[in-house]
Amino acid sequence: MALPDFSMRQLLEAGVHFGHQTHRWNPKMKPYIFGDRNNIHIIDLAQTVPMLSRALQVVSDTVARGGRVLFVGTKRQASEIIADSAKRSAQYYVNSRWLGGMMTNWKTISNSIQRLRKLDEILGGEAQGFTKKERLNLEREREKLDKALGGIRDMGGTPDLMFIIDTNKEKIAIDEAKRLGIPVVAIIDSNCDPDLIDYPIPGNDDASRAIALYCELISRAAIDGIARQQSSSGRDLGASSEVPVEPALEEAAEG
């Protein structure tokens, strides 16, 4: 295994270079802006390339030493991609809504996860002794908990690294990571504050093709970390149940 390759052309085809309207920018992003076209800021991909490469290395290194990566993206166009990418790389995700205290009040979250597991047991069996209405209420409770916590139910504690799409929308998640000293990899669009992020990646955080490309690369970096961890522990990768790798870079670029 090796870190995933990507090219400037793939970034261009995915629209990574398109920022927001110039009047919406955050002046702190000035070092990462190439210029503007039709009142839209153009992000400097010559900086994105090395910063993305560094972020991929951090993800791989974190997983290689047994760390957990939490993918966070709750906006409509990121939600499904975030979940799929995290699952494919045996990591964790929040893609519905960030609940306040999700990291800083882990004990309460753990109790809710235990409740989710209990509901799975109850509803997975015959669920005897419940009326139809009671069972329906339990199913609704389970569905609500699974939507909020399903992606972190097996995380077993706070993550070692967070990967975030849209730092403005996920500000609470970033604040909690800062309080706990959890490093953050994130896409920073032209309207974001890069100072909040440990490993920023300048790029479009709205276009679904761009989001798919980032998530594919981060996912494959995590898979590389798994392979390195197994290799260093002397495990036979051929005999182990490998995490499936999907060669979707081209597909992601095409949307």
From Swiss-Prot:
It holds the Pfam family Ribosomal_S2. GO terms for biological process: translation. Residues 230-255 are annotated as: Disordered. Keywords: Ribonucleoprotein, Ribosomal protein. GO terms for cellular component: cytosolic small ribosomal subunit. SUPFAM superfamilies: Ribosomal protein S2 (SSF52313). InterPro entries: Ribosomal_uS2, Ribosomal_uS2_bac/mit/plastid, Ribosomal_uS2_CS, Ribosomal_uS2_flav_dom_sf. The keyword Glycoprotein does not apply. Belongs to the universal ribosomal protein uS2 family. This is Small ribosomal subunit protein uS2. It comes from Rhizobium etli (strain CIAT 652). The gene is rpsB.
